[in-house]
Amino acid sequence: MSLPMTETVTDPAETAPPTAERSYPRFAKPQRVAFVQSSWHRDVVAGCWESFVREIVERGIVASQVDLFEVPGSFEIPLHVQMLAKTRRYTAIVAAGLVVDDGLTGFVAQTVIQALMDVQLKTEVPVFSAVATPHSFERGSPNTEHFRQHFATKGADVAHACADTLLSLERLRGQVAAGIV
């Protein structure tokens, strides 16, 4: 008696040679993204911007279509995001900042995230958060490098979420316009 053969299906990106470029869906329309970054702890947060741009370009958005805006701190991010969303110039907005534990961390982080969600829902411009609130950040301590790495990883993650959401919304808007949904 022989057992039935099974075939393993793998993701082509996992089996592609390291030099092969990955292929992503193309956007039907040009996309423009605003990246609003806190300048507080810029040396830690900057990796988020750098990895975001690298990844978003790989996903099909031209680097010249990604604009960087710096604000003093994370608390100032939502107002800038709202003003940028109201211009209708951007198809997506990313927020990046570091909220340091000073007794108000929970209040500031919750306020910022809720405000970003409110902007997104009111304007229908997707807003992505790379605002981090570590419990143990001290400038100059050995864990500073850990947080730099975290922001670099977060930048790539938010680029993927941004591109995937823009593609999803583009399809959804097309279906709505066609009366399918």
Swiss-Prot record:
Belongs to the DMRL synthase family. Residues 1-23 are annotated as: Disordered. Its EC number is 2.5.1.78. It catalyses: (2S)-2-hydroxy-3-oxobutyl phosphate + 5-amino-6-(D-ribitylamino)uracil = 6,7-dimethyl-8-(1-D-ribityl)lumazine + phosphate + 2 H2O + H(+). InterPro entries: LS, LS/RS, LS/RS_sf. Keywords: Riboflavin biosynthesis, Transferase. 5-amino-6-(D-ribitylamino)uracil binds at W40, S74, F75, E76, L98, V99, V100, S129. Signal peptide: none annotated. This is 6,7-dimethyl-8-ribityllumazine synthase 2. Pfam families: DMRL_synthase. It comes from the Bacteria. One of its GO terms (biological process) is riboflavin biosynthetic process. One of its GO terms (cellular component) is cytosol. It comes from Rhodopseudomonas palustris (strain ATCC BAA-98 / CGA009). Pathway: Cofactor biosynthesis; riboflavin biosynthesis; riboflavin from 2-hydroxy-3-oxobutyl phosphate and 5-amino-6-(D-ribitylamino)uracil: step 1/2. Catalyzes the formation of 6,7-dimethyl-8-ribityllumazine by condensation of 5-amino-6-(D-ribitylamino)uracil with 3,4-dihydroxy-2-butanone 4-phosphate. This is the penultimate step in the biosynthesis of riboflavin. One of its GO terms (molecular function) is 6,7-dimethyl-8-ribityllumazine synthase activity. HAMAP family: Lumazine_synth.
